[in-house]
């Protein structure tokens, strides 16, 4: 259709000297090579930025001398005023929000202002909304982040996780999916999978689907780490996976198209989607923290997003220092409230006709995770919806498994009793039992694997992982289910500065972390070359760190940047066999 894939554009680059010279409050800059103007607002360590261009008629902003707080700028054309600390126009009030630019520091301590180009790709080839017949567009909630969309004579499914756990054994479904879920998947014309996390890319679910429809079209974004990077290892036979570029309409038929967008301005892992049918847009931001670099379409017909929080091991799995139970409880309460308010503000700003909170309906149901379940409180979708309704006219929908929203009816008359059809009375909503054993058996199979008879697996694995030249020492301790040392398990140090494995901590000054991991999960992860989200997001570790610093480079590497193929354990074992038996045998494959 003549569209061009979105790219990340550097609008302005400030040197370390210029960064050090930034003053508190408003800073004006011009890119001398392009002649474009920008505003940077500094509040202690926080930076916000935007183009120096009024949204009204493109006028230039200057300092507002009437603003003693030093937060607002004034347009030279019509005296419109923008509060740069909030990116909201204050004169006239409640008029616009200024589009914000992404601020990043690069490896050379330069400050970059970034934007996706084109920034609003959905505006290309625009379509005017047509009237929808009743029943023409129906959205049925299945469970967690899985929606079944009927769009005319086509069916589309989002993120099918319908059976089994996610993140090793840490997450289980809160809601009981409709009994016909597999039939619904098989009848779909296409499936969208937002990202590689196992509560969205569920291989147990896809294995069931592949047994009946291995050629079902599945669409994913062109992320740096492929969504299906582990397909061959999974053993699931899917033959029609389509990787599509970001920001380009994908035409399904004359009435239906969709566009996949990245999270932030770098296509690392997460994506979101706009589905458009007869000009009516459905926006699903899934788990994105800054979808499309913060630019999203306004006044869509239906918006859905995550809401719950709790999708991280922090702070529940941490101990020592400040991590008392009281501190954790207060932190969790504060963070959940911040997330709730952020989602409510986002919905208020975007003004969709209808909003649906989803993608947060999981529970830590295995008995061994009782502490996590009790500590890791989630947001209540009804509380969010009530907050939204207080501040806007947006219609809200808290979905239950099998409930169906008729978009045509709801857009015409939100009070129509047939606009949302709830599941039949007596339908089971919440799961009360989970089939743990088959999935735990898969994990337990790794514990006795021959690989772990040779202590040299440690060097082999971390060499394969490829993370080094970073001043961090980590102690890895294998544990039982209750995080007590596993009898006969490994307890070792890794020094990532030179990728060595010392018997004692080095004498130099160094940050230090202790990671206690359930033996079945860590060995399953090591054996199969899986990402450490299985451990961290799955609550399969207990951590201590000194000092209390988050080592982004370390965790980002093990959560997203590990090699795409697992370690060559076959070659490793052959080497060990050739060099003779012995649990302490040192081996290195070539």
Swiss-Prot record:
<dbReference type="GO" id="GO:0051537">
    <property type="term" value="F:2 iron, 2 sulfur cluster binding"/>
</dbReference>
<dbReference type="GO" id="GO:0046381">
    <property type="term" value="P:CMP-N-acetylneuraminate metabolic process"/>
</dbReference>
<comment type="function">
    <text>Sialic acids are components of carbohydrate chains of glycoconjugates and are involved in cell-cell recognition and cell-pathogen interactions. Catalyzes the conversion of CMP-N-acetylneuraminic acid (CMP-Neu5Ac) into its hydroxylated derivative CMP-N-glycolylneuraminic acid (CMP-Neu5Gc), a sialic acid abundantly expressed at the surface of many cells.</text>
</comment>
<dbReference type="GO" id="GO:0005737">
    <property type="term" value="C:cytoplasm"/>
</dbReference>
<dbReference type="InterPro" id="IPR027033">
    <property type="entry name" value="Cnh"/>
</dbReference>
<dbReference type="InterPro" id="IPR017941">
    <property type="entry name" value="Rieske_2Fe-2S"/>
</dbReference>
<keyword id="KW-0813">Transport</keyword>
<dbReference type="GO" id="GO:0046872">
    <property type="term" value="F:metal ion binding"/>
</dbReference>
<dbReference type="Pfam" id="PF13483">
    <property type="entry name" value="Lactamase_B_3"/>
</dbReference>
<comment type="similarity">
    <text>Belongs to the CMP-Neu5Ac hydroxylase family.</text>
</comment>
<dbReference type="InterPro" id="IPR037339">
    <property type="entry name" value="CMP-Neu5Ac_hydroxylase_Rieske"/>
</dbReference>
<keyword id="KW-0963">Cytoplasm</keyword>
<dbReference type="InterPro" id="IPR036866">
    <property type="entry name" value="RibonucZ/Hydroxyglut_hydro"/>
</dbReference>
<keyword id="KW-0001">2Fe-2S</keyword>
<dbReference type="InterPro" id="IPR036922">
    <property type="entry name" value="Rieske_2Fe-2S_sf"/>
</dbReference>
<keyword id="KW-0479">Metal-binding</keyword>
<keyword id="KW-0411">Iron-sulfur</keyword>
<protein>
    <recommendedName>
        <fullName>Cytidine monophosphate-N-acetylneuraminic acid hydroxylase</fullName>
        <ecNumber>1.14.18.2</ecNumber>
    </recommendedName>
</protein>
<feature type="binding site">
    <location>
        <position position="56"/>
    </location>
    <ligand>
        <name>[2Fe-2S] cluster</name>
    </ligand>
</feature>
<dbReference type="Pfam" id="PF00355">
    <property type="entry name" value="Rieske"/>
</dbReference>
<dbReference type="GO" id="GO:0006054">
    <property type="term" value="P:N-acetylneuraminate metabolic process"/>
</dbReference>
<comment type="pathway">
    <text>Amino-sugar metabolism; N-acetylneuraminate metabolism.</text>
</comment>
<feature type="binding site">
    <location>
        <position position="78"/>
    </location>
    <ligand>
        <name>[2Fe-2S] cluster</name>
    </ligand>
</feature>
<feature type="binding site">
    <location>
        <position position="54"/>
    </location>
    <ligand>
        <name>[2Fe-2S] cluster</name>
    </ligand>
</feature>
<keyword id="KW-0560">Oxidoreductase</keyword>
<feature type="binding site">
    <location>
        <position position="75"/>
    </location>
    <ligand>
        <name>[2Fe-2S] cluster</name>
    </ligand>
</feature>
<keyword id="KW-0408">Iron</keyword>
<dbReference type="GO" id="GO:0030338">
    <property type="term" value="F:CMP-N-acetylneuraminate monooxygenase activity"/>
</dbReference>
<keyword id="KW-0249">Electron transport</keyword>
<feature type="domain" description="Rieske">
    <location>
        <begin position="14"/>
        <end position="112"/>
    </location>
</feature>
């Amino acid at each position: 259709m003549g569209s061009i894939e979105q790219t990340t554009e550097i609008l302005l680059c400030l040197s370390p000297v210029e960064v050090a010279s930034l003053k508190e409050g408003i800073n004006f800059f011009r890119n001398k090579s392009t002649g474009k103007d920008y505003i940077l607002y500094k509040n202690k360590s926080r930076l916000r930025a935007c183009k120096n261009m009024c949204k009204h008629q493109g006028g230039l902003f200057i300092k507002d001398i009437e603003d003693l707080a030093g937060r607002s700028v004034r347009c030279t054309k019509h005296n419109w005023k923008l509060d740069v600390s909030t990116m909201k126009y204050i004169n006239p009030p409640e008029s616009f929000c200024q589009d914000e630019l992404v601020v990043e520091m690069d490896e050379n301590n330069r400050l970059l202002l970034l934007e996706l180009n084109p920034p609003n790709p959905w505006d290309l080839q625009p379509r005017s909304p047509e009237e929808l017949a009743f029943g023409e567009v129906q959205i049925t909630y299945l469970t967690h982040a899985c929606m079944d969309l009927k769009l005319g004579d086509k069916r589309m499914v989002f993120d099918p996780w319908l059976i089994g756990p996610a993140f090793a054994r840490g997450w289980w479904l809160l809601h009981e999916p409709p009994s016909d879920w597999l039939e619904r998947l098989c009848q779909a014309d296409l499936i969208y999978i937002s990202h590689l996390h196992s509560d969205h890319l569920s291989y147990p679910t896809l294995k069931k689907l592949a047994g009946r429809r291995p050629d079902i079209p599945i669409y994913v974004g062109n992320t740096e780490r492929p969504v299906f990077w582990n397909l061959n290892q999974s053993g699931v036979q899917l033959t029609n996976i389509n990787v599509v570029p970001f920001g380009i309409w994908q035409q399904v038929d004359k009435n239906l198209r969709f566009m996949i967008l990245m999270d932030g301005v770098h296509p690392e892992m997460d994506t979101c989607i706009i589905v458009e049918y007869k000009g009516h847009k459905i926006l699903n931001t899934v788990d994105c923290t800054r979808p499309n670099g913060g630019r999203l379409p306004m006044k869509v017909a239906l918006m859905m997003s995550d809401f719950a929080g709790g999708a991280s091991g922090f702070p529940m799995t941490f101990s020592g220092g400040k991590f008392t139970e009281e501190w954790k409880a207060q932190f969790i309460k504060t963070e959940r409230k911040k997330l709730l308010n952020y989602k409510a503000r986002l919905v208020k700003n975007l003004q969709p006709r209808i909003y649906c909170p989803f993608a947060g309906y999981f529970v830590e149901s295995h008995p061994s995770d009782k502490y996590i379940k009790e500590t890791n409180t989630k947001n209540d979708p009804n509380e969010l919806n009530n907050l939204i309704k207080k501040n806007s006219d947006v219609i809200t929908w808290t979905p239950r498994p099998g409930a169906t929203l008729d978009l045509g009816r709801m857009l015409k008359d939100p009070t129509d009793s047939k606009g949302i059809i709830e599941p039949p009375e007596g339908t089971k909503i919440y799961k009360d039992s989970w089939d743990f054993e088959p999935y735990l058996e898969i994990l337990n199979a790794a514990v006795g694997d021959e690989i772990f008879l040779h202590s040299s697996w440690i060097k082999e694995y971390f060499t394969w992982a490829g993370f080094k030249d970073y001043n961090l020492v980590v102690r890895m301790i294998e544990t039982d289910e209750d995080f007590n040392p596993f009898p006969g398990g490994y307890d070792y140090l890794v020094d990532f500065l030179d990728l060595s494995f010392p018997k004692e901590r080095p004498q130099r000054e160094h940050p230090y972390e202790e990671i206690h991991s359930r033996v079945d999960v860590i060995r399953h992860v090591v054996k199969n070359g899986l990402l450490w989200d299985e451990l961290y997001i799955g609550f399969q570790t207990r951590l201590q760190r000194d000092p209390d610093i988050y080592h982004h480079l370390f965790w980002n590497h093990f959560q997203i940047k590990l090699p795409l193929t697992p370690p060559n354990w076959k070659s490793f074992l052959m080497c060990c066999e050739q060099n003779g038996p012995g649990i302490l045998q040192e081996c290195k494959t070539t």
